[in-house]
């Protein structure tokens, strides 16, 4: 009995371990779980029968053989289970590249097979839609290239005005009114502006027309009777004129009588004047001493008009000449004292593209003080699109005048746009996306490269400055023409990746706004908050 106790203790433990091992294999198998469960139940029933047999007859040989087999299977199952758990702990976690499996797969695995097949059919339809979208993007690119050719003569004229090759006329310099910018076309009304004449007005107009016809000498038979009536009325008016002529002599006689009466009154006035003269004679003796002085004063007064009349004419002429001569003389004296030459009007529009680029959001902070004297030689910025059959892309061309900084007259920056669908990117059809950008090499003159700096050190012994060969990159606008290259294998560093993202944004801004509407960047209107709060659609403005 003492020997049977350890067997009775170990057997149920072995059976329990066997059941755990079978359960773990059933979970790992997936679809074969039902078959494994059935086999496990059969094994459990057999083991249960063997355990019951061994408990009833511990001395029989069959019970010993069954117990030994069950114990051996239990020990093997326990050892295999322990090794599996240890191996799972030792395996490291998968890398990030291995975890690129989309999370939607886990959801699809739970769906029935029939539903999965339908979902795959929808994926194939989406791929066809992406192909249509590539055709749409290519058509947009062709339209941009077509209308860029229409804008080319306008851009050429802008280039000529900026660089003083063409002087605009007065009509071109006039500010266009808002009516000329209106997008609504005015319809021409065919209806007459004037109201139709009334019945009485029609008769008056007909009479006026007939009178005009008479003056021209045309003969109208219908109007002859009316003309005769008018001629008959004319002699009736003549007697009135004669009566008026008869009245005229009567009025003349009355005027003569009035003149005679006035002539009678004149002697009375003369008598009064004589009486006044006698009064003056009575007063005159008191002022006899001053008679000579009065006569001298009279003679002087007579001579004064002649003396004053002659010099007044030149005095007036001098007053007229003073405002014409004095300011010019004063200005000339001031210029002679200061020694400054007369300022001449600048030619063209100086620093046009420098001002434009400084007002661009992402590009302005890149321009350093050392870049400004170089960008003053920038004469034009143009945009060219790729030809048909080539990958979709566009190139910016920066034209420079001859300058002492580099030998290039043309600097280019090319952007290539992704035009093929990517199965790993489910949102390919959301518009343009720049895939790659390429710059150009700048042929700098000696000591004029602003994109790099050289380090200098002062040794402690000699104290002389030694130039080391190590070159340090410097912040500059011209780094825009040397972007980091995208490797075919591997990844970019976070710093280079951020530079490319900002570079793509700058290329999109130049493509959409700067080339087409550079004048608004030059005047600074683009940075006005009024233009940021509203959006322009033709001649109408809508709030965001």
Swiss-Prot record:
Region (Disordered): 1-109, 168-345
Principal cellular location given in the protein's record: nucleus
GO terms classed as biological process: nucleosome assembly
Any one Pfam family match given in the protein's UniProt record, by short name: NAP
Annotated keywords: Cytoplasm, Nucleus
Tissue: Expressed in brain.
Record carries keyword Cytoplasm: yes
Nucleus is among the record's keywords: yes
Ranges of compositional bias, category Low complexity: 35-83
InterPro entries, sorted: NAP-like_sf, NAP_family
Composition bias, Acidic residues: 168-192
CC annotations in GO: cytoplasm; nucleus
Segments of skewed composition (Basic and acidic residues): 207-228, 235-277, 314-332
Domain of life: Eukaryota
Family: Belongs to the nucleosome assembly protein (NAP) family.
Protein name (Swiss-Prot/TrEMBL): Nucleosome assembly protein 1-like 3
Organism of origin: Mus musculus (Mouse)
The gene coding this protein: Nap1l3
